[in-house]
Amino acid sequence: MKTIIAEKPSVAREIARIVGATKREEGYFEGGGYAVTWAFGHLVQLAMPDGYGIRGFVRDNLPVIPDTFTLVPRQVKTEKGYKPDSGVVTQIKTVTRLFKESEQIIVATDAGREGELIFRYLYHYTGCATPFVRLWISSLTDKAIREGLRNLEAGGKYDDLYLAAKARSESDWLVGINGTQALSIAAGHGTYSVGRVQTPTLAMVCARYWENRRFTPEAFWQLHIATDGCDEGTVKFSSSEKWKEKEPATELYNKVKSAGTATVTKAERKEKTEETPLLYDLTTLQKEANAKHGFTAEQTLEIAQKLYEKKLITYPRTGSRYIPEDVFTEIPKLLAFIGNLPEWKDKVNPKAVPTRRSVDGGKVTDHHALLVTGEKPLFLSKEDNTVYQMIAGRMIEAFSEKCVKDTATVTAECAGAEFVVKGSVIRQVGWRAVYGEEEKEETIIPGWQEDDRLALKAASITEGKTKPKPLHTEASLLSAMETAGKEIEDDALRQALKDCGIGTPATRAAIIETLFKRGYMERCKKSLVPTEKGLALYSVVKTMLIADVAMTGEWEKELARIERGELPADTFRKEIEAYTREITSELLSCDKLFARKDSGCKCPKCGTGSMQFYGKVVRCDNAECGLPVFRLKANRTLTDDEIKDLLTDGHTKLLKGFKSKQGKSFDAVVAFDGDYNTTFVFPERKTTKKFSGRKK
């Protein structure tokens, strides 16, 4: 008998059907000489410190660095601590028996770093010695599964992939366990979660937040002139210079008005080619789904995974935007299929030869770029269909012709000032025709030449203000994670920097969601805004190694080298252990930042604990309560006396100097609501607002 193990029951069911394992047993299918079983995610995980006999959250026990990591069945949290998940334990027993009864194991977990680890951890935990081979496929269509089963690969081929996955898992454990415990011990109360990837990600969100909020807009003035264009149209020039003072701008404006004409000093005309966009990888799909449709990164990943399991698209957790030559031979057939979908009628030219910008086998790693499979997309929800059609539409774009434009830049002089206008005309629409993006052209520029004199129709002066960088959205944060904070627009350069990004395409959505779950940031429309807790953590760790984005990017680069067989995993392990010792020491030394003093106030929530003043937070010292009150409210830090008013009366006096997320100043009362969260009460509503906080 051979045992096939899949990552999920739904995938196991499809494989079982194909190999003839039609008899349903407890935890597996059987038949045709096969047993087809499954995991449900990780059945086995790394043990917590108590699994090594080490008590957690004790300063003298840190850092916890096991000589050898222990594997245990997946744990669930109970009132008495963590215990093995009973359903997981049952499935492990089933898998163990099947492994030992088999002559061969076929590994059919997801074909990627995490899928490999799911199997290898389970294999090692069971103490199994049965030889295994790998089913490595990029889609779950019947054709792909059958072809994969005919071409099974040696299990050892993916040893380096496993070693990279294991190194990532152990490094996350070392940094997360030790960092979280060290910072929480330093704080004295509460739990402050930190992690190898989550903390640098939070740091990018907080740094952008403060850059945005502390930005001071500066006024500037700009001049404009208008002259006759083509077909009775008007061409508007703008001054190259922007003046910081109104007076010189106004003085020049008056001269321009009096001049009556402008003289062309330079006229440049060029052909501009816009390359077709590359195919989607997961991160690019998530970014565009967020920007265009408001989907979260996690939502897009979940939808893509569903589409994959429905056999509609190829493997979603890919980091490549290219396909190899053998896949390119299938593209004409897939484009013809897309062209028959009602959404893309008349968008695919059946006679056109697909272009090759997205074809490069050397840039394909585990999996190629996202493609539709040619299975009909029936009965999809609105959201699922949106993501499916994004992938289909991008395929049409990627294999279309380039967009070619004729561009013109004309510079003119008037009253000693330089004015510029730019325009373009599309000569070949190419890929931009797919979504009807033939663009509203800026301006059609007449055939002006140097020294031509232009009669002015009008002149104007406008006042503007400089703007800060916007707050991060999930789309911009994914871009920042992809390039470790470097701001790069070019697709090809982004691809080159992927090994230096933080997180992986498969993990970035989960990292972002972790920051929400930990209460470190929240969504405000499309923007990501750090919470008071997130800002408090950032203020403590922002200059420390744990928040160093570039260093985290280097760790990801090292993991990629392990995966390629270029770096021994033991070398990485030694480096991450040294890093763990350093960040643990740094975080434990934060206790002076968390030095506390008694406020003299009872906790308004539990009535038994005393509220303790810390640097950034006031917290109840009753471990069962731990009510936190963060000092920082809307860019204003509450004083000790203001905090005492809040604790004793349930509200402060009317306070000045707050600043909204839009940068506007306001006055307000800070009060407790019914759940002892702080809220603002505004003067005009003060008489009708009933304060929820109670005086103890």
Spans of model-derived segments:
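Short glycine-centered, acidic/aromatic-flanked micro-motifs in structured strand/loop junctions
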Residues: 109, 287, 317
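Intrinsically disordered, low-complexity regulatory segments
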Residues: 1-169, 173, 179, 350, ...
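Basic, low-complexity terminal or inter-domain segments flanking catalytic cores
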Residues: 2, 81-83, 125, 180, ...
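Amphipathic alpha-helical transducer elements in NTP-driven molecular machines
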Residues: 9-16, 33-36, 40, 59-62, ...
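C-terminal or mid-to-C-terminal helical accessory/interaction module adjacent to the motor/catalytic core
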Residues: 87, 142-227, 269-270
